[in-house]
């Protein structure tokens, strides 16, 4: 199985992050994100976190949190990651992290997905083509509660924690949502 998420912001001790998600403390948020993640993700699953995985100077605490997550973790760098080479190095040392990259392309069947931290316009000029011939951008960054926030700009779907009740999203489910809306997307 392939899961996606973005903007865990583990250990980000700012009320505008954890309070907005309905938590009373950063520790409560951390514990609940790990719990919800591990409730659906198994050790053999692939998980793409599309940026801003953790915050704070305590890299060892961040490493322990990431290593407590099930699955083979693929990290797409976010805006908080690029500024911290030490954080990137910590990600690379986590036993369950299999790659740390700026962006990625993956496929599910014939459907291509472009994974990035920031929403990326994949184009509306191919709206006459079938869905399988188009590229879907999966992203984060905005902390939106609506995964379809940018659909007017292209085939863009948000996987932030806020949009999915602080849980990872199954790639098969995302593709099915697009198929269900295919006529509407033209």
Predicted regions, residues:
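Core catalytic region of metal-dependent phosphoesterases/phosphodiesterases
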Residues: 3-5, 10-105
């Amino acid at each position: 199985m392939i899961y996606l998420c973005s903007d865990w912001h583990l250990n980000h001790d700012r009320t505008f992050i954890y309070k907005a998600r309905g938590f009373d403390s950063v520790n409560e948020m951390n514990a609940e994100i790990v719990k919800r993640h591990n409730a659906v993700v198994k050790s053999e699953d692939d998980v793409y976190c599309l940026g801003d995985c953790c915050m704070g100077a305590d890299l060892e605490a961040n490493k322990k949190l990431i290593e407590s997550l099930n699955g083979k973790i693929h990290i797409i760098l976010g805006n908080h990651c690029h500024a911290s080479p030490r954080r990137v190095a910590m990600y690379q040392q986590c036993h369950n992290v299999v790659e740390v990259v700026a962006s990625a392309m993956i496929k599910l069947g014939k459907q291509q997905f472009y994974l990035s931290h920031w929403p990326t316009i994949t184009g509306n000029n191919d709206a006459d083509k079938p869905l399988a011939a188009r590229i879907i951008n999966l992203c984060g960054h905005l902390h939106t509660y609506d995964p379809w926030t940018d659909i007017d700009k292209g085939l863009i779907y948000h996987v932030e924690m806020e949009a999915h009740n602080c849980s990872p999203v199954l790639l098969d489910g995302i593709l099915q949502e697009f198929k269900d809306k295919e006529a509407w997307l033209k």
